[in-house]
């Protein structure tokens, strides 16, 4: 089951089974965005 939910602000929560991915998009300027992925096991990848 895939659940896509938009939180307050520019963050989107994607839930696949028991795995939750939080995608936070922050526009710092033209062409700049920050994506944050958070997994239940505590690994966070920022790009």
Where are these regions (language model features)?
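Compact, glycine-rich, soluble single-domain proteins
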Residues: 1-47
